[in-house]
Structures are given as structure tokens and as C-alpha cells.
Design a protein with these regions (language model features):
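C-terminal beta-signal and adjacent terminal beta-strands/loops
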Residues: 507, 601-608, 632-690
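Short acidic/polar hinge/loop motifs at secondary-structure boundaries
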Residues: 129-158
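Gram-negative outer-membrane beta-barrel transporters
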Residues: 406-413, 501-505, 525-610, 689
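Extracytoplasmic beta-strand/coil segments of soluble accessory domains associated
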Residues: 54, 86-132
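Periplasmic-side early beta-strands and strand-to-turn transitions of outer-membrane beta-barrels
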Residues: 162-163, 175, 182-184, 192, ...
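Short, acidic, small-residue-rich periplasmic hinge/interaction motif at the N-terminus
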Residues: 18-78, 125, 301, 490
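N-terminal periplasmic accessory domains that precede
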Residues: 85-88, 105-109, 121-126, 141-144, ...
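Outer-membrane beta-barrel signature, preferentially recognizing the C-terminal barrel domain
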Residues: 278-301, 337, 392-394, 438, ...
Length: 690
């Protein structure tokens, strides 16, 4: 709250419009006066941060969205030198990033279940779901389809949105909107050197305009990694922290017809030898993800009141890991998840202009999945071999409708419902409702209610290898209820503020726990109830001189109960009670460069209980990250970005998932509570566009 008051005080000291015209494409002046010209540019830039498309599959303003939403603009992405989507959203109120050296995962409002891989967050790229069909994984770091150079803005939508999207929109949605041809150079290339993440090179092209365009991009990353020490795993330092990724895309549209093809391949090594790997091996573990997303569709305005859109899509995913074992041949896991689907939706304005509207649609997806685990040399399925082979095909159908209206200037509402049928898991009905009371463009309140669900993935519901994981038993859908009140205000030009009070209750959450019949194996179980409630505030401020600032904090209380016990608060693994972020960026100093600084605070967190004694593990201390960036845009066609991450050099002790526990010897089991986060990193990026 102090942050909001401070920004408000700064705003009253300088009531000028809130954007630096030099950071935006040139626009015609509104008049001959400089102030009017700046105001015209301000209006254009403000629309970028005030419009949301991912919360209801249509454009809405922030004041009329049935969620608490933050939009990370392209200008903010460039100024602060974010290198991945994960870095960009880690500075958003209530959001934190967890890199446990297996994957990059995102926590929201204190909820990040160890061993989860963003499966409770729906990730969209230009409206298409990235979550794959085998494990429901969605990458947001280097393990994703999208280069940060392609991103126009990122929408962070908190809370369940199953009433529109069905499964996976559980804790929230990350909607990545890429740059269109009109805002992309005809051709561009960028390369960077990073002291931990190695070399990153990307290039792309764009032709056409708003209604007819073709654009594409490529990105390659070769990570150097670090040498690290985890005494619980090995007495000596461990290397083998590298990774390699490749991503490419082609996107096009012609009038109302659109299509996109995106693909990536990502390999990550882990020096910490998960799944009882041999820590003395030079490369004890690596995993490879490969994914292809194809989508095409058409949108047509049938009448001024009726718009219809249809799309078809395919999402093809493959996973493989390789575990070097002590005293035996290596062990391999393979997973495959291919999904094919189609959606038809429409919007009809019952009362115009925008007084009452109905959005409705139907969607069907077919999933073909396969899992296989084997010791090398024995890869045949039974009865001819010892491999664990699990084929499973299923389909999901959904139908949804949402009514929204604004009976008066100051009052609006939304109410929606979706029914989903999973042919092998569960059927769910997901409602949401919202009431909006506002003085338009000045201040308002939103009262929000939503229910959501998440089906266990094919990996959770059916996978086993009898080496690290035992067979799951009768898993069912997770459910969540959300209550939230949002106060928002734009007290002066350039200043936006939000204060939220929230209560989330998630039940039947699938957790990765020791098998009650064999503690040396992990098993997926519908064991958990998680409750999170608290306050969240954020603010952003721009001036016409080019200053930009943002900040936020979340104070939450998170509780957990397993198998029907009473909810206990304070000792939930990976659940910080306090999150904070702050960023300030200068105008172009000397007309050349922006200087930006950012701070991220991650509160103290509990780790998992000791595997043997059941006693609480050591707590992870609070962590403060400081970053600095200098950004020189369009210097004779060149862009230059230089920065330093984690200036203090203090590593966050990341809460470790059960994958790292040493359980091969039942008489000498070791719980790995924490693994080190990244240290200080320097980077330099140079690009050219024409």
C-alpha cells in the first residue's frame, strides 16, 4: 500500500501524460502543441496495457474482466531486458518463478506444488493452448515455443477460468500475444552472450499489415550452466547443468483467416541425478521435450451483431529422459501425447451498443497418449520384455456460454457456465460470475466468484515404471473455488492501481507422494487440499518524459491438508507468505539509453517433510533479487541491451521436489530439501532490424 501511495504522490507532482513517445511507433500529433502530441501517444500506449483478450476469448477492458489481470507490455519487456516469458511474469504481483534444475515452473499466490510443471496454469500463445496432451506441461522459460523477441504483451490472469477454457485454467492463465507484422521490422536478428545461459541467437521476418500478413522467427539457445554443490546428494561439486533449445514459428493471416505453426525442441541436463541416478556419472540425467503446435481458423462478422469463429488444431508432444543408474544399465522413460481438436464459438449482441451480449461455443479434443519405461537392453513390452508400457486414448468435449451486460453507465455483470466430459476421468460443471461497479476510466470495484477444475494428466493418472513411480489408483479431477474483491483506480493520468482480497480453496489436488505400500517409490495421489487467502496490490506509472515504474506485493496465508485432515497453515512447501516487486526505468538519457532497475522479494518458505521421520524440513530463507539493465533502442538500426541479474549474488535455496530424494536403499533414505538457484549473471544482447 505504501508503494501505491508513493506512486500517487509522484503522479500528483507531475500530471503529464504517461509515455515516452520515443519508445513507440510514430503517431500523428493531435495538435501543434507538444503536450497534445504526447497525450495522443499516451492514449495509444495505454490501450496496450488496458485491453485483455485471454480472459473471455474476446477483447475486454481491465475494469470489465472477471479476473484480477496484469498486462506486461512490450515496452516493459524491452526496457527491463527480460529474456524469457518466465522472467517477465516473475515481476508481476503474486507471481514467482521456481527453477529447480528440472524445469521452470510458476507459482501464483503461494501455490506451487513441488513436482508440478505449470500443469495448473493454462498457457496460451495467440489464443492456442500450449499445454501438451501427455503431462499437461507448458514451458515458460527456454522450454517454450515463443522467443521473447516475438512477444507484444503478456496477460497474467489470476484464478480459475474453467467456465471458458475447461481444464488446466486452474490457478490462472498466461496469455502470450505475439507481435503482428505492423509492429515488427521487415527483418531482424539478435544475438546475446550470457554468463550462465550461454549464447542465444534469434532472427525473424514480417510482411504485410493488420489484415494480411506473414511472419516467422527462429531461436537457438546453448546454455553453459553452473557447477553446484548439494551435500545431501554428493559431497563434491556437480557439473552438467547445460541445456540446448531450438524454437521456430510461422504465422499468417488473410482477412478473417488465420494460422500458426510453432515447434520447439529442448534438452535439459540436471547435475543433481534425480530418480536415484548415479551422481558420479559425468551426465547422470537429461530430459528432452519436443512439441509441434498447428492451428488454423476463420473469424467472420456475419452481421453487426453476430460474429462466428471456428478453429482446428493439433498439438503433438514427445518426452524422453535418460537416467544413469549405479550398478545397472541406464533407465529410460518415454512419453507421447498427441491431441487433435476443433472449436466453434460465436458472439451475439442481444442489446446494442454493448448493453447485453452472449458468447457461446463448443469444443472437442481427442487425445492419444503412450508411456514407456525400461532398462536399456530390455525395452520390449510384456509379455516379451520388462518394459512398463501404458497406452491410453481418451477424448474431452465441452460446451460453454457466458452472458455479459452493462445495464447502466456504472454497473456491469458477467455470468458463465461450462460443462466438460472426459471419457475416462470425470465430468465437471464450471460456473463463474462477476459484478462490476465503476465510474468509467476513474475507479471501480469488481466482485468475483469462480469454480474450476483440472483433470489429472495421462502421465499422472496412468504412468508407472516400478522404478521411481508406482501405478496410480483411481485419480479424479481436482476442483477449486475462488472468491475475490478487486478495487481499481486511475487517480491521475498515467497512474493505475489495484487492490485485491482473495480466497482460494483447491481440493483433491494430485500430489507426488511416497507410495504407502513402498516408500521407495513415488505415487500420484488425490491427497491434497490447499487454501490461499490474502491481499494483493499493484501499481504502474508512466510520464510523458519517459519515466516508467511498477510495483506490487502479495501478503498471503497458505494452508494444506492431506487425506481429509484439518487445514494447517504456515508449513506448506514452496508457499511464501510475502511476495514483492518493484521496477523503475528512466527516460532515454541523452536521447540514447534507458536505465532500469528492478527488485524481487520472495518470502521465507517451508520445504517438504523429512521422508523418513515425517518431521518438517528446514525452511528456505527469504530471498532478495536485484537486477539492472541498460537498453539502447534503434541506434542506427541497432538495439543493444546489457544487464546484470541477481546483483547481490546470493542464491535462492529453491524447494526441491521429491524427484531428487535418494530412496534406492530403503535403509538409508535421504530427503533432498533444497537445491541452489542461479547466481549472479551478466548478459549482453545486440540486434539489428530494417
Amino acid at each position: 500500500m505504501l508503494l501505491i501511495l508513493a506512486l500517487a504522490g509522484l503522479a500528483h507532482a507531475d500530471p503529464a501524460p504517461a509515455v515516452d513517445p520515443g519508445d513507440l511507433p510514430p503517431l500523428p500529433a493531435a495538435s501543434d502543441e507538444e503536450a497534445s502530441s504526447a497525450a495522443t501517444v499516451l492514449a495509444a500506449s495505454s490501450a496496450e496495457e488496458d485491453v485483455v483478450v485471454g480472459a473471455a476469448k474476446r477483447e475486454q477492458s481491465l475494469g470489465n474482466v472477471a479476473s484480477a489481470v496484469t498486462v506486461v507490455s512490450g515496452d516493459r519487456i524491452r526496457r527491463f531486458g527480460y529474456r524469457t516469458v518466465a522472467e517477465a511474469i516473475a515481476a508481476v504481483a503474486g507471481v514467482y518463478l521456481v527453477d529447480n534444475r528440472l524445469s521452470y515452473s510458476v507459482g501464483i499466490r503461494g501455490l506451487n506444488i513441488p513436482g508440478d510443471y505449470n500443469t495448473r496454469i493454462l498457457v496460451l500463445v495467440d489464443g492456442a493452448s500450449v499445454n501438451e496432451g501427455w503431462a499437461a506441461f507448458a514451458g515458460l522459460g527456454w522450454d517454450t515455443f515463443v522467443s521473447i523477441e516475438d512477444v507484444s504483451r503478456i496477460e497474467v490472469i489470476r484464478g480459475p477460468v474453467s467456465s471458458v477454457y475447461g481444464a488446466n485454467a486452474f490457478f490462472g492463465i498466461i496469455n502470450i500475444v505475439t507481435r503482428g507484422a505492423a509492429e515488427t521490422p521487415r527483418a531482424w536478428a539478435k544475438t546475446s552472450i550470457n554468463s550462465i545461459n550461454g549464447s542465444i541467437t534469434s532472427a525473424g521476418f514480417a510482411q504485410g499489415g493488420v489484415h494480411q500478413q506473414l511472419r516467422g522467427s527462429l531461436q537457438f539457445m546453448d546454455r553453459i550452466g553452473e557447477t553446484l554443490s548439494v551435500p545431501a546428494i554428493a559431497p563434491t561439486s556437480l557439473s552438467g547443468d547445460g541445456s540446448i533449445s531450438f524454437a521456430g514459428s510461422i504465422v499468417g493471416s488473410y482477412e478473417g483467416t488465420f494460422g500458426q505453426v510453432r515447434a520447439y525442441r529442448y534438452r535439459r541436463d540436471s547435475p543433481f541425478a534425480p530418480y536415484n541416478g548415479d551422481v558420479t556419472a559425468g551426465n547422470p540425467y537429461y530430459a528432452t521435450d519436443t512439441q509441434l503446435l498447428v492451428e488454423g481458423g476463420h473469424t467472420r462478422e456475419v452481421t453487426k451483431r453476430l460474429t462466428i469463429a471456428g478453429r482446428a488444431y493439433a498439438n503433438l508432444y514427445g518426452y524422453a529422459d535418460h537416467i544413469v543408474q549405479q550398478g545397472s544399465a541406464p533407465f529410460d522413460d518415454q512419453g507421447r501425447g498427441d491431441s487433435y481438436g476443433a472449436e466453434l464459438r460465436g458472439r451475439y449482441e442481444l442489446v446494442v451498443p454493448q448493453r447485453l451480449g452472449l458468447t457461446a461455443g463448443t469444443e472437442a479434443t481427442y487425445y492419444r497418449t503412450y508411456s514407456k519405461s525400461f532398462t536399456e537392453g530390455d525395452d520390449a513390452c510384456p509379455p516379451d520384455g520388462g518394459a512398463a508400457c501404458v497406452p491410453k486414448n481418451f477424448n474431452i468435449e465441452g460446451v460453454y456460454a457466458e452472458l455479459d451486460g452493462q445495464p447502466s453507465k456504472n454497473i456491469g455483470f458477467t455470468g458463465g457456465l461450462r460443462f466438460d466430459n472426459n471419457s475416462v476421468i470425470d465430468r465437471r460443471l464450471s460456473p463463474r460470475a462477476a459484478l462490476f461497479i465503476a465510474e468509467p476510466e476513474k475507479y471501480g470495484i469488481k466482485l468475483l466468484y469462480a469454480e474450476g477444475f483440472r483433470n489429472p494428466s495421462a502421465y499422472e493418472a496412468f504412468f508407472y515404471d516400478n522404478t521411481s513411480f508406482s501405478r496410480p489408483i483411481n485419480l479424479h479431477a481436482e476442483t477449486i473455488r475462488s472468491y475475490e474483491a478487486v478495487l481499481w483506480a486511475k487517480p491521475v493520468s498515467g497512474l493505475s492501481t489495484r487492490l485485491s482480497g482473495f480466497y482460494w480453496d483447491a481440493r483433491g489436488v494430485v500430489e507426488q507422494l511416497p507410495d504407502p505400500n513402498d516408500a521407495s517409490l513415488l505415487q500420484f495421489q488425490n491427497a491434497g487440499q490447499f487454501v490461499s487467502y490474502g491481499l494483493e496490490a499493484e501499481a504502474s506509472y508512466r510520464t510523458s518524459q519517459g519515466w516508467y515504474g511498477f510495483g506490487g506485493f502479495t501478503a498471503e496465508r497458505v494452508g494444506q491438508a492431506d487425506n481429509g485432515a484439518a487445514v494447517a497453515y504456515g508449513d506448506v512447501a514452496n508457499a511464501p507468505a510475502l511476495l514483492g516487486s518493484l521496477g523503475i526505468s528512466t527516460p532515454r538519457i541523452g536521447g540514447i539509453a534507458h536505465l532500469s532497475g528492478a527488485m524481487t522479494y520472495l518470502g521465507e518458505r517451508a520445504t517438504r517433510p523429512d521422508l523418513v521421520t515425517g518431521e518438517p524440513g528446514p525452511r528456505t530463507p527469504a530471498w532478495l533479487g536485484l537486477d539492472a539493465t541498460i537498453y539502447l533502442p534503434n541506434v542506427r538500426g541497432f538495439d543493444v541491451t546489457a544487464g546484470i541479474r541477481n546483483i547481490l549474488g546470493k542464491r535462492d535455496l529453491v524447494v526441491a521436489p521429491g524427484d531428487y530424494d535418494r530412496t534406492a536403499d530403503p535403509a538409508n533414505q535421504v530427503t533432498v530439501f533444497q537445491v541452489p538457484g542461479e547466481g549472479r549473471e551478466l548478459f549482453l544482447k545486440v540486434g539489428y532490424a530494417y
